[in-house]
């Protein structure tokens, strides 16, 4: 009994030390490595999204992968825009020569009004300049408005190769096919130009640093039939794939749904809320890993409006919350990759404490 009382303080101090060491340890995915840092539309928290400036900044900040969303021009060229409607991310509305191009289209069942990449040749798009999408939240980015053109996918691949030569490290690319059924329906499918460019720049096998992602199912299955490049099935918290009426993303995240995804894809891309609920991890990461799928979550942003309540800081003068704390919490679920508008800060959040 006396020995037990004597040992209690030692045991207590040892437990505290172990807890401190665990908290200081780097966050690791189940693979034993830190989660990949995927620059969401480039370093889009600091530069207008989907510009060469945003991608280069992300690479310079140490991102493992950069993510270009891909749409097509009228002459079949892949360019980087989050949507094919470009009124909110370019100066097209200030070009009177294109005023008559404004139109209303039905895309994935939704009516959208604006200017669309498929109505412009690449040469015409070259006359436009990018603008900050989230100007109210990121006013500092607006100083870069009208400086950068819309890049082609090939220009992005050339940038990656140039930065690899400069830095001596491999830099991954993570393209998303945007609205593939819609584009195929108007005679502008993604698959052939996408695979041709990737092959031209040396991306041909599952060992190469590339993931192709989509919210749809059919184009991923078609890609799997002709390529071994790694594929990611994107999912959302609501709705379902535009090309699979009657199927919901919730259905796809059941054990059976994950098994079906594993037949054609190498991983899933859910929103962060699907892996980390307010009460704790949801178990989705474990279920996905059990069927051999990687998990790459989107999107970590610094602003309070994008963070769960527990990680918000309402009094912050820049409107930013506890981004580092949230990044660590998400990484702690065992995810294999994390999309972020702020790749440098995401990387720093996962570094071990000194």
PLM segments and residue spans:
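N-terminal secretory signal peptides that target proteins for export/translocation
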Residues: 1-11
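Phosphate-group recognition and catalysis centered on beta-loop-alpha active-site segments
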Residues: 2, 28-354
């Amino acid at each position: 009994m006396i020995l037990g009382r004597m040992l209690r303080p030692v045991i207590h101090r040892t437990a505290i030390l172990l807890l401190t060491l665990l908290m200081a340890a780097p966050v690791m995915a189940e693979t034993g490595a830190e989660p990949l840092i995927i620059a969401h539309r480039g370093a889009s928290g600091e530069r207008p999204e989907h510009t060469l400036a945003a991608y280069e900044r992300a690479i310079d900040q140490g991102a493992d992968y950069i993510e270009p969303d891909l749409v097509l021009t009228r002459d079949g060229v892949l360019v980087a825009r989050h949507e094919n409607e470009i009124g909110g991310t370019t100066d097209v509305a200030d070009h009177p020569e294109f005023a008559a191009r404004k139109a209303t289209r039905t895309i994935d069942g939704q009516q959208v009004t604006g200017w669309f990449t498929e109505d412009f040749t690449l040469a015409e798009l070259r006359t436009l300049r990018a603008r900050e999408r989230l100007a109210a939240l990121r006013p500092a980015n607006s100083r870069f408005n009208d400086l950068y053109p819309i890049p082609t996918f090939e220009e992005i691949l050339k940038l990656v190769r140039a930065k690899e030569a400069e830095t001596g490290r491999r830099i991954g690319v993570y393209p998303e096919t945007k609205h593939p059924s819609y584009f195929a329906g108007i005679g502008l499918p993604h698959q052939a130009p996408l695979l041709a460019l990737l092959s031209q720049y040396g991306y041909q096998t599952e060992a190469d640093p590339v993931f192709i992602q989509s919210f749809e199912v059919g184009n991923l299955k078609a890609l799997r039939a002709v390529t071994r490049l790694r594929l990611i099935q994107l999912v959302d918290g609501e709705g379902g794939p535009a090309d699979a009426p009657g199927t919901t993303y919730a259905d796809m995240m059941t054990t059976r749904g994950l098994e079906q995804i594993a037949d054609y894809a190498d991983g899933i891309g859910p929103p962060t809320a699907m892996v980390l609920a307010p009460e704790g991890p949801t178990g989705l990461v474990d279920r996905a890993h059990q069927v051999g799928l990687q998990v790459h979550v989107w999107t970590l942003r610094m602003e309070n409006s994008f963070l769960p309540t527990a990680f918000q800081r309402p009094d912050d003068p820049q409107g930013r919350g506890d981004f580092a704390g949230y990044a660590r919490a998400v990484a702690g679920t065992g995810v294999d990759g994390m999309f972020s508008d702020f790749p440098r800060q995401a990387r720093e959040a996962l570094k071990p404490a000194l």
